[in-house]
Amino acid sequence: MLVTGIVCPVALVFILLADRLALSTAALVAAAAIAGAFAPPVTVLTRTVWRYRFDDPAERKTAFALDAVLIELAFTLGPVLVAVLLAVASPRVAFTAALLLVALAVPVFALSPALKYWRHQPGVERRLLGPLADPRLLAVYAVTFLLMFALGLLEIGYAGFATAAAMPAFAGILIAINSIGSGTGGLLYGGAQLAMPVERQLPRLLLLVVLPLAAHTVTGSPWLLAALALVAGIGIAPALTVVMLLISANAPSRYATEAFTWSTTFLVGGLGAGHALGGRIVEGYGARAVFGVAAGAAAAAAISALAVRQRKLAPVDR
């Protein structure tokens, strides 16, 4: 954690000063790669702390739901802050603000009183593949990848739709509306008392994402699409909350941190893959095709979630 808190900000400083240091393109790419590779794993460690901190299932669900809502809030407010700084200042100022936030992340986390709940697992047997050797966790990771793949496609689809409608700024609005829907759904889910086991909730929550995504393919109205974006978001944060609950329940204590780390890997990997494929599809076939593939990916996630539902969950190791 300490290493990432130093290396990542330093790499970002090199990027910030690239022109003054006369860095080559290769050096700039290397600095960006290092910054990404050493990104502080604050979210991973936070979710691990939640696992240890909350024994009560209802409290743990609320914690993970709040985590999902805060992630949505960050993804919504971050671009807005950048846009404002770009409008009133310069790209350098916007990048500096991002750098400062990254630099503050590790100290703030390290000083958090929540760390007193952290548990070390000394002298335990570990396997090479760790959590990847557990079929229950692999099923959850597959759902995570497919859902985030769908969301990556969705973001590109919004950009393509807005560009085709000669309303390029509308893409950011659609993404923000979708995030608002997700945050609202996360808050509602966190406060709900549901008797249904979480593994059975997951396919149903994903279905709430699939249906409005499918409706994206048949509308050409920006305002109707905005309404569908809101509805499509409602199931996202609850679904991600359930994913984290399932990882928390299935991961042995010796692999708790690794399990959430791999979850983040599949999450980011799915999002990036969706962006990459979405860009190719939107150029050749348009936004509606991207929305269709996104709906298909979300449907695949819902079907994959049935395998998670049928497995008996292991208790959390203490």
Label each residue range with its predicted role.
Residues 7-22, 208-220:
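C-terminal ends and interior cores of transmembrane alpha-helices
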Residues 24-42, 145, 225-238:
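Hydrophobic core of transmembrane alpha-helices in multi-pass small-molecule transporters
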Residues 33-73:
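Cytoplasmic helix-loop-helix junction between adjacent transmembrane helices
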Residues 40-54, 158, 238-251:
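Intracellular juxtamembrane helix-capping segments at the cytosolic ends
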Residues 86, 184-198, 282:
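Helix-to-loop junctions at the C-terminal end of transmembrane segments
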Residues 131-175:
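Helix-loop boundary and gating motifs at the non-cytosolic
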Residues 199-243:
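C-terminal transmembrane helical hairpin of 12-TM major facilitator-type secondary transporters
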Residues 254-285:
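A late C-terminal transmembrane helix in Major Facilitator Superfamily
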